[in-house]
Amino acid sequence: MTSRASKASKPLMIASTSFVLIWIFVAAFPFVWTLWGSFKVQGDFFSKADWRYALNGTRTAIETGGLFTGAGYEGAWVQQEFWRAALNTAIVVLFTVVISLTLGTLGGYALARSGHNYAFWLLMIALVFRAMPHITLVSGYLLPFFEWNLWGHLPTTIIVLVAINQPFTLWMLHSFFLNIPKDLDESAKVDGCTQFQAFRHVIIPVMWPGVITTGLFSFLLAYNDFAVTSMLLSKDNQTMVPAIAGF
């Protein structure tokens, strides 16, 4: 039976491995191709005459004397000062994630332990708010920001991104808190802890996987945002995504 099962599973294993390898190639090709083209001159990578120029670097060799060149990176990071956009992105993402996780952890724990029906409706309102198009929410901030001279600065963009990401963090962390037994809170209180001490010293250590997971999603949402950052930031304070779109 074992030999028959192994013989029957061998074609399936080959088919599964082949599918995974093909899928990896298809998914990785755009990134590898873009990375390869970044070391070529524009005439090679965007050549309409012969796509093989992007491979052999014919024009790159003529213009630079080599098959590869780092002129594109120098032009972007030094001449166009792309490092400013990278620094702005790091600042925006860091504060957005920290504030979102802090408020989401406190709010999610409170809603999970409240035991009242209004907790469900608050989460539903948050979900509706999260489902609204970002461009609709941002347009409501533009006029006040212009009147109060707040437009174009990083703190205002961080506030808006936190407001947009907060419903998501509430939902995620609330669901994680629901999976933690309330007996842990009660045991901590029996040992003399207050509600906040039980939350800090007992619940949070158990919640770290959920906090890290939610933080990763919040990081991706803030890092990849285009609508908010492109509309609320000036050219000098742009993050990486709108800066890349402007090249």
Label for each model-derived stretch:
Residues 4-8, 12-247:
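A structural signal for multi-pass alpha-helical bundles of membrane permease subunits
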